[in-house]
């Protein structure tokens, strides 16, 4: 957990853009309900959560961590969180679907009064599976790849006021966006876009869609 705090602080130091969401961040944080951030793989759910909490005192648990999962003990984990993050106001549970029976544990934390932000992309996080345990306790926040305005913003161009000298660049970005989409990683590394998208496509179809619908033959 201490190493995860160091990773959290490193991620918070990197440059990002503010994402567009249905609800303003300050309104979300004021709500005592569970903030559930879902969406496809690699669209920036964790980054959005970190940015939303950047100016607050928050604790962080990343369940995309085999060591944490292999040695998981709820009581020890919570005590360690309180030791590492003194008097934290929010608790961010990243990729929490990797924890067996995560929904029951999250509900328990909610009942204890923790203000929770959780992220997940696996098929197990989809609304149908959550309906029984979390009903009435969470606010859904759907994340998607960058929109075209967000893509333009990444290049330090205000999409609402494009200078004449930047218009050719924006047209080029629009063409690339139509061909490649708006996944954050390919915006940063266009040269590797096709290979990255191919791998991502396989992951989403073979791991998420096939698993959710119990498709055995994916040929």
Model-derived features with residue positions:
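Short regulatory helix/loop adjacent to the ATP-binding pocket of P-loop NTPases
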Residues: 124-140, 154-156
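Conserved lysine of the Walker
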Residues: 45-46
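Structural recognition of the conserved hydrophobic beta-strand(s) that form the central parallel beta-sheet
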Residues: 92, 115-121, 142, 151
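Interdomain hinge/linker elements that couple catalytic modules in large macromolecular machines
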Residues: 1-9, 149-219
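Short glycine-rich substrate-engagement loop in P-loop NTPases that contacts/grips substrate
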Residues: 59-90
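Hydrophobic anchor at the beta1->P-loop junction of P-loop NTPases
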Residues: 37
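A short, basic N-terminal segment
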Residues: 1-28
């Amino acid at each position: 957990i201490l190493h995860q705090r160091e990773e959290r602080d490193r991620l918070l130091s990197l440059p990002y853009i503010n994402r567009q969401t249905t609800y303003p961040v300050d309104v979300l944080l004021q709500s005592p309900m569970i903030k559930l951030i879902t969406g496809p793989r690699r669209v920036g759910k964790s980054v959005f959560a970190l940015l939303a909490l950047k100016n607050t005192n928050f604790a962080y648990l990343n369940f995309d961590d085999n060591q944490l999962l292999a040695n998981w003990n709820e009581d020890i984990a919570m005590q360690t969180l309180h030791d590492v993050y003194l008097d934290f106001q929010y608790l961010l549970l990243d990729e929490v679907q990797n924890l067996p029976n995560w929904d029951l544990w999250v509900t328990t934390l909610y009942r204890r009064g923790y203000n929770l932000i959780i992220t997940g992309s696996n098929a197990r996080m989809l609304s149908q599976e959550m309906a029984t345990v979390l009903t009435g306790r969470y606010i859904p926040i759907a994340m998607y790849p960058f929109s075209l305005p967000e893509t333009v913003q990444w290049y330090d161009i205000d999409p609402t006021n494009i200078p004449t000298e930047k218009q050719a660049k924006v047209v080029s970005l629009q063409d690339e966006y139509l061909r490649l989409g708006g996944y954050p990683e390919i915006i940063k590394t266009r040269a590797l876009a096709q290979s990255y998208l191919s791998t991502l496509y396989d992951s989403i179809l073979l791991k998420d869609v096939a698993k959710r619908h119990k498709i055995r033959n994916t040929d």
